[in-house]
A protein has these predicted regions:
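ATP-dependent carboxylate/phosphate-activation module, predominantly the ATP-grasp catalytic core
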Residues: 185-189, 193-260, 282-306, 317
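ATP-grasp fold ATP-binding core
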Residues: 118, 140-163, 176-191, 203-207, ...
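Conserved metal-phosphate-binding beta-hairpin within the catalytic cores
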Residues: 253-290, 327, 334-335
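Peripheral (often C-terminal) accessory segments that flank ATP-dependent C-N-forming ligase machineries
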Residues: 302-395
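A conserved helix-loop-beta module that forms one wall/lid of the active-site cleft
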Residues: 97-165
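Short acidic-glycine loop/turn motifs at beta-strand connectors
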Residues: 165, 195-200, 271-275, 309, ...
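Hydrophobic anchor at the start of a short beta-strand
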Residues: 25-26, 124-125, 178, 323
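ATP-binding N-terminal substructure of ATP-dependent carboxylate-amine bond-forming enzymes
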Residues: 1-109, 134, 377-378, 384, ...
Length: 395
């Protein structure tokens, strides 16, 4: 039996799909969720213990540590699927040959380089490479009517993105490169693409959700997705949803051909009255993975693998709406069992999650959008209430 290694920040959802396929599955995951399937060949980086804090993800996560601890698995595996947190470019040339997916993503993961690649062909926000905040402020003074954000040229999940203003006290991390980008206000959207050597096709469009959608606090941290994209799921009145979907499908496929994307990939957009803006490409299995599986009732890991092996994959039509919402802890709290059937990525009971760290994920499906939205939002209220009941004093 061929050996398949899943490696990244959280392998739970992919592991569930992989175990339905004919592989000897290996897994290295940073997070240790209590609902992650237990398998023989498994490494968990984050040790969760009773009455102990799981810490701050940004401070503790280190992709090099994951790769170092996975050396034996990497050597033994026939195939490797890196997910969020691990770049294909982190692997040696020899090990890159084992990757099911894109092997060289340097033109995409470097967001400034990506912008330079697409600026003449696609609608994208104006972007500048900067050395410091003062330089960003000087550039912005030339266009006083334009808002700008500062973001790292590498990274995902909406972390370390800040809205610039002239009295900004933004601190840039030493040793990290940043860029200044025109801030496009509008509706966050995304496409899921499936590509092989011979074809590229958009399989689903979705409403992308950030913290700003719920709190209007200029936070760009990823919260989740709702799909498929319809007049209801876009959560805003728009003139022609069919036209938006068509433009997203065409643009996503053009990007997939331009960068020769294979397997499952994603494209993030912002849509407003001026049109559709390309924000970034995610050249790996993306956060919509589980929602797409629930909506289509199909194994998307199987589809990803077959596409990477240049097999034709028939994608069914959406059968359900699906909604994913990550709950970030409203306070420092000690996790206690919550009796809901639509919560995933659960902490171990008795462990402590710090304020604003990911607590768990709500994922559900329904053929009726309003019922689905009410179910997820009701679960969200319950989870936040339970977290506050079990609040812990700050250290």
């Amino acid at each position: 039996m061929e050996k398949l290694l899943l490696i990244g920040i959280n392998t739970r959802s992919m592991l569930n799909s992989a175990l339905k396929l004919d592989y000897d599955v290996f897994s290295t995951s940073y997070f240790s969720t209590s609902d992650t399937p237990k398998i023989e060949n498994q490494i968990i980086i984050l040790e969760e213990k009773d009455d102990e804090s799981s810490g701050i993800f940004e401070d503790k996560f280190n992709s090099k540590e994951i790769l170092e601890k996975s050396k034996d698995y990497i050597d033994e595996a026939d195939y490797i699927i890196p997910i969020s947190g691990i770049s294909p470019n982190d692997f040696s040339r020899k090990d890159q040959k084992k990757i099911l997916g894109n092997k060289d993503v340097s033109k995409i993961e470097d967001k400034f380089r990506f912008y330079k690649e697409i600026e003449d062909e696609f609608n994208a926000p104006e972007t500048f490479l900067i050395n410091d905040v003062d330089e960003a402020i000087e550039i912005s003074k030339n266009k006083p009517n334009v808002k700008y954000i500062i973001k790292p040229i590498k990274g995902s999940g909406g972390y370390d993105i800040n809205l610039l203003n002239n009295d900004s006290s933004i601190q840039l991390n030493n040793g990290e490169k940043f860029m200044l980008q025109e801030y496009v206000e509008g509706i966050n959207l995304s496409s899921s693409i499936l590509g092989s050597r011979d074809y590229k096709k958009t399989i689903m469009n979705s409403r992308l959700l950030t913290e700003n959608d719920f709190k209007s606090n200029n936070s760009f941290i990823y919260i989740g997705n709702i799909l498929p994209l319809t007049d209801e799921s876009i959560l805003t009145k728009v003139k022609d949803i069919a036209k938006i979907n068509e433009e997203m499908i065409e643009t996503s496929e053009n990007l997939a051909y331009k960068f020769d994307l294979i397997g499952s990939n994603g494209v993030d957009y912002i849509y407003n009255k001026k049109g559709l803006y390309v924000i970034e490409v995610n050249p790996r299995i993306q956060g919509t993975f589980e929602c797409v599986e629930k909506s289509l009732q199909t194994n998307m890991l199987d589809a990803h693998i077959k596409s990477c092996q240049n097999e034709n994959v028939e994608i069914p039509k959406a059968k359900y709406y699906a909604y994913k919402k990550i709950i970030y802890s409203p306070c420092r709290n000690k996790y206690s069992k919550i009796n809901l059937d639509n919560i995933y990525d659960l902490p171990h009971i008795g462990t402590i999650t710090e304020k604003s760290e990911p607590l768990l994920t709500i994922i559900d499906k329904d053929s009726d959008f309003k019922k689905l939205y009410e179910k997820v939002e009701n679960s969200s209220r319950i989870v936040n209430m339970e977290a506050k009941i079990h609040q812990q004093d700050a250290i």
